[in-house]
Amino acid sequence: MIPRKTILPFAKPDISDEEIAKVKEVLLSGWLTTGKITEQFEETIKNFTKSKHAIVLNSATAGLHLALRALNVNAGDAVIVPAFTFTATAEVVFRCNGIPLLVDVDRDSYLITEKTIMDFIDKYCEYRKNQLMHIPTKTIIRGIICVHYGGRVCDIDSLKNLAKKYNLFLGEDAAHAFGSMYKNKMIGSLTDFTVFSFYATKNITTGEGGAITTNHQDIAKKIRRMRLHGFDIETYKRKKNVYDVISEGYKYNLSDVLSAIGIVQLKRNPEMLLKRKFIHQYYQNQFKNLTGLKLNPEYEGSSYHLYTIEVPNRDKFANILKEQGIQTSIHFKPLYKMTYYKNKKLYSIQDYSNCEAIFKKILSLPIYSAMSEEDIQDVVDAVNFAYENLHQKKNQKKFVLPFPSHK
């Protein structure tokens, strides 16, 4: 196989002339920071998710942090999060002086489930005086943050029932899942809060940015205030020179320049999502006969943010793809394997058998709406080449290929 002449990046934003024109319009307006365009972006998100409140921020991490602050997560508190996620989901709990309790995920979906949480609760927790206590750390578990990995939505109904049973809040880290649906309903209004990411690699992007949606007015009010230093009124709405600081605050606001990109991206989301769905299905059809590759799970309502495969000899497989000009990534190295989390001495590898099994084999392939037909076919050809290359070497050594049969 002849390698590509240029490297195919793992991810690339899909920016059209319309986004560029909208940004130019804002640049010429004279108002660049948070203002009416940001307000307009929030309104479109609110309508899209059918939520009562939408607040845009400079990152999804900021959204997770402010959600926990609005819910008064503090020292002595803990929050259940999946071990198989990006660090932001857990790090914000530490930032609130609480403890993130890492829970294993389902082996097939890579999602946190009622079962994985209950296995953890049965082993480490007690429910007394209307509070769920984590015995090893002597903390009160305040809530659950589920992660919609790769665009696949967790079973929200079962998690809501579990949260209600133990008097917990339920939030969604939907950094991968803007536009995902659960039982034919758009996510964003189904739990206490939902956080989205508009980072450069996401389905829709503002370069850097995020949003939080909620139906709780008190949560929304606190978050809107905290995102900009705890001011009593937004800068662009002031009619007087004097302002007041009435709560804790941070510098988490999003600018009109970036919101302008988001407005157009959201308008284009249906076409971009359709392209991702096409690529996902094309990969599924092209790889279905590669015995032993565990293909990306099929999930109704997914936003197809990631396309993953599980393959033995993952690192060798990835290196062959790299040699052919195809960038890949790994989502994720489990948090308990990270130095920062290991140094906390809170987590035992024995609790994460599914995470361990997934991490050994998982590999993410390029899937994004800016890919051309040639790009897509290059990925398919490179995967087939890598598969045949490793298969041939195994046969030459008279080893039995350690692939389980693909379901």
Task: Annotate each PLM feature.
Residues 99-109, 329:
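Short beta-strand->loop structural element characteristic of the AMP-binding/adenylate-forming
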Residues 31-78, 92-96, 102-104, 126-135, ...:
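Phosphate-binding glycine-rich loop
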Residues 96, 165-166, 324:
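Helix C-cap/helix->beta junction micro-motif
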Residues 85-90:
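Conserved coil-to-alpha-helix start sites within the AMP-binding
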Residues 39-43, 51-54, 115, 122, ...:
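PLP-dependent aminotransferase class I/II
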Residues 1-32, 36, 244-246, 366, ...:
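N-terminal "arm"/small-domain region of PLP-dependent enzymes with the aminotransferase-like
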Residues 108-206, 211-218:
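Active-site phosphate-binding strand-loop segment of PLP-dependent enzymes
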